């Protein structure tokens, strides 16, 4: 399905991004990854404008086109108490501005029928304390998605995915953290990667501008103290 397609993934060296990259490679795609972690990919900070320009230039020089762009790299998570101006600005640069700018840089070489996937978060609609930088960035990329979908109508389809709690190399959930999910378990990177590949396929040709929440039903679960076994421990 994706044989010889050119796929660009930010934050593709670990976690969800790594799984997405692996699944596209299994389908025969040429996958271009940028990540701040060291490895056999383009190493750089996507919060930096010149880095994005250099990376995009390399992809365009090598392949001449882009079929799929997955804006996956996560911003830092800091709250109102500790987050500085610089921290917050960098989080928005990584989480929102980079997605906008890479789309702009690749616009002249987007293949007909191209697909752009933005990885948001269930935090684009709900919050925990002290998560302002991350939550603002995820809310921003969710809104950017439908704006781009309209602007790029006829050129590319643009959708976003909002994962809930996902077991990755960095975080593994156990016990009540897992069983509280209506789906009965925590998500895994393949849950997200499968949706990415579906949305980028011809089977999703009538889907654009959408945000799909993959969170095991957590954001649909009404939680109040003393209701259906839920308890608040102050």
What are these regions (language model features)?
Residues 103, 137, 145:
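Active-site helix of classical SDR
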Residues 72-77, 217:
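Conserved NAD(P)H cofactor-binding loop of Rossmann-fold oxidoreductase domains
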Residues 160-161, 175-207, 214-216:
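C-terminal helical subdomain
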Residues 2-31:
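Canonical Rossmann dinucleotide-binding motif of NAD(H)/NADP(H)-dependent dehydrogenases/reductases
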Residues 108, 149-154, 205:
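Alpha-helical segment proximal to the catalytic Tyr-Lys
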Residues 208-234:
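Short C-terminal tail/terminal secondary-structure segment
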Residues 79-92, 177:
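Substrate-binding pocket helix/loop in short-chain dehydrogenase/reductase
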């Amino acid at each position: 399905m994706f044989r010889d397609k050119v796929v660009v993934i930010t934050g593709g060296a670990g976690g969800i991004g790594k799984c997405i990259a692996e699944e596209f490679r299994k389908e025969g795609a040429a996958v271009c990854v940028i990540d701040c972690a060291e490895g056999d990919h383009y190493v750089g900070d996507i919060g930096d404008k010149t880095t994005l320009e250099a990376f995009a230039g390399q992809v365009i020089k090598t392949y001449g086109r882009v079929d799929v762009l997955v804006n996956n790299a996560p911003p830092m998570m800091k709250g109102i108490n500790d987050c500085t101006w610089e921290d917050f600005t960098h989080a928005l640069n990584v989480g929102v501005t980079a997605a906008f700018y890479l789309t702009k840089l690749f616009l002249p070489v987007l293949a007909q029928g191209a697909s752009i996937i933005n990885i948001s978060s269930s935090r684009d609609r709900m919050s925990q304390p002290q998560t302002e930088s991350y939550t603002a960035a995820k809310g921003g990329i969710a809104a950017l998605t439908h704006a781009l979908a309209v602007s790029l109508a006829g050129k590319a389809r643009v959708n976003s995915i909002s994962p809930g709690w996902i077991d990755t190399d960095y975080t593994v959930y156990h016990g009540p953290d897992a069983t509280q999910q209506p789906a009965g378990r925590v998500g895994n990177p393949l849950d997200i990667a499968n949706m990415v590949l579906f949305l980028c396929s011809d089977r999703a040709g009538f889907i654009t501008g959408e945000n799909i929440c993959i969170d095991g039903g957590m954001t649909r679960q009404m939680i109040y103290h003393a209701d259906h076994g839920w308890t608040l421990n102050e």
